[in-house]
Amino acid sequence: MAPPTRQLLNAVLVLLLLLATNHQGTGVVVASELRCQCLTTLPRVDFKNIQSLTVTPPGPHCAQTEVIATLKDGHEVCLNPEAPLVQRIVQKILNKGKAN
């Protein structure tokens, strides 16, 4: 095979792979939602920096409880649900919600 033909074949192959990847892109997002979101956790975070808190119970997507804090600067951090400080933060937020 002559070099220009090989380059053309490689370019076509790359284009086909990109099109196939782009077409399957939606499925990849769904697959990533079906697994644990927290790979590492923090044992503590300053309560004043938390904007919102999401607690996801164990389920088919993940066998462990996940606590995800959205901080006031927009960052999301995973907290260790077993840590006493995290449990107190969750209780404070739950009690605050009951008071309203």
From Swiss-Prot:
List the SMART domains hit by this protein, alphabetically. Answer: SCY
Q: Which Pfam families match?
A: IL8
For this UniProt record, the keywords arranged alphabetically read as follows: Chemotaxis, Cytokine, Disulfide bond, Inflammatory response, Secreted, Signal
- Primary location group: secreted
Identify the Gene3D superfamilies for this entry.
2.40.50.40
| Record carries keyword ATP-binding | no
Please give the positions of the paired cysteines in each disulfide bond: 36-62, 38-78
Reported function:
Chemotactic for human polymorphonuclear leukocytes but does not induce chemokinesis or an oxidative burst. Contributes to neutrophil activation during inflammation.
Family membership noted in the UniProt record: Belongs to the intercrine alpha (chemokine CxC) family.
Q: What is this protein called?
A: C-X-C motif chemokine 2
Q: Which organism is it from?
A: Rattus norvegicus (Rat)
